[in-house]
Amino acid sequence: MSLFETDSWSAAVFTGRWTPAAGGDAPVVSPATGAEIGRAGSANAEDISAAAERAAAAQRGWADTSFEERAAVLRRAGALLEENGDEIMAWLRRESGAAPGMAGFQVHVAAAECYEAAALASQPYGEVLRTGKPRLSFARQVPAGVVGVIAPFNAPLILSTRSVAPALAVGNAVLLKPDPRTAVCGGAVLAEVFRRAGVPEGVFQMLPGGIEAGEQLVADPNVRVISFTGSSAVGRKVGEAAGRYLKRVHLELGGNSPLVILDDVDLDAAVSTGAWGSFLHQGQICMTAGRHLVHERIADEYVEKLAAKADALPVGDPDRDEVALGPLIDAGQRDKVHSMVTTSVDAGAKLVAGGTYEELFYRPTVLDRVTMDAPAYADEVFGPVAPVMRVSSVDDIADIAKASPYGLSLGILTANPMRGMEIADRIPSGIVHINDQTVDDEAVAPFGGVGDSGTGSRFGGTRANIEAFTETQWVTMQADVARYPF
């Protein structure tokens, strides 16, 4: 059975049922072809406000549902994602430009997020406390209420599910606002999956929209927690707005992650790892290896081999061809990437591969001898670009790596893992991989960054998800009513 066996989702938002949005609708466009491949609802502030009211009304009943029933719903959601994997992967290829491997990975991880969330529903949420009075004293975790999720375009299925599933598991209602550029993969798919899985009406709602919808979601008094994944620039604005309303906000933001290649490494393995870390999904991943810090003894050979690999990677429409890289999401992103490459070359970097494009298809690019002030090194590119900086010592590596304001992921490649850990201890980062590249994700592992990469929030794993989507409540209980001196 097709996930979208009817066109009821077309030009609609999901409020527990598919319905037109007060804000109208918008086209769903394939970045590979430029063709309109569907239409999605486009929520405005009125839509968000009404949805938040419905969510607040529905949340208490969902929280009162037994943990077994919530877990069963999430297990069914995971199974539906797997059963409809081929159809979902086709949408990921067409709508987000994901190559087949990346599309399959998203389905796998999204299903895993649902299964892990199902297990979360039965976890103990509290602890018994010591008390100096004749009473029972304990702390417990209670649902936050209504959680607003703002998800990006780049890995839309994973980055929506990562917040939606655990928030539902612990008894919250959820409003999901996917990026309008990936309203199907990041929104409609999950709406239909959770509808079929049995989430009650009003508990999960999906409303694509632009700035107006996002601002209302952050401001609405019925929404108590915001989970935002996106750029650091927008994340700052979301954090500032949430602060005005004393609202909890989880910010998973950009990265400019360093990949350190030491001189004792297996060079061919390092080149394979570096290419994957920088070019996977056209570099449109927050954890992408954005800076290659290569020991000067092996730098010439590393750059030569990395450039050869970049030149050999096929680029094209992932829905029609066997390709390693698909298109960038839109012309604005392509122009930003190309500007950062050309200005870095003007600043002294050497272009050794790529640096060209046709339409939205950008060739994997290698820049050698970049400096710390080159745009492609200093900031997040979010494109298939591997800037290489040559380093001469461990002190250089640590100083250069931690000079960036970002701190999401760190990869260190070396024949001596303990040497790698010693370096890692000197570089602030939310994630560290010794002898692997910077891009990885597992539903059981905490995920998040420091500095400009986020608020240190974590997604994944029991403790992180409970902390993210519940509030701590202190409770005391005694047999008789207390008496006082007056």
Region spans (language model):
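Conserved C-terminal structural/oligomerization subdomain of aldehyde/semialdehyde dehydrogenase
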Residues: 33-39, 223, 260, 314, ...
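Short, well-ordered beta-strand elements within core beta-sheets of diverse protein domains
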Residues: 36-43, 58-64, 149, 259-262, ...
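Rossmann-like NAD(P) dinucleotide-binding subdomain of oxidoreductase/dehydrogenase enzymes
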Residues: 126-269, 391
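ALDH superfamily catalytic-core signature
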Residues: 233-371, 395, 434, 481-485
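N-terminal Rossmann-like NAD(P)+-binding subdomain of aldehyde/semialdehyde dehydrogenases
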Residues: 1-135
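Residue-level signal for inorganic ion chemistry
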Residues: 34, 70, 92, 114, ...
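Structural signal for hydrophobic packing residues in well-ordered secondary-structure cores
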Residues: 59, 63, 78-85, 89, ...
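Residues at or immediately preceding the N-termini of alpha-helices
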Residues: 31, 45-48, 67, 85, ...
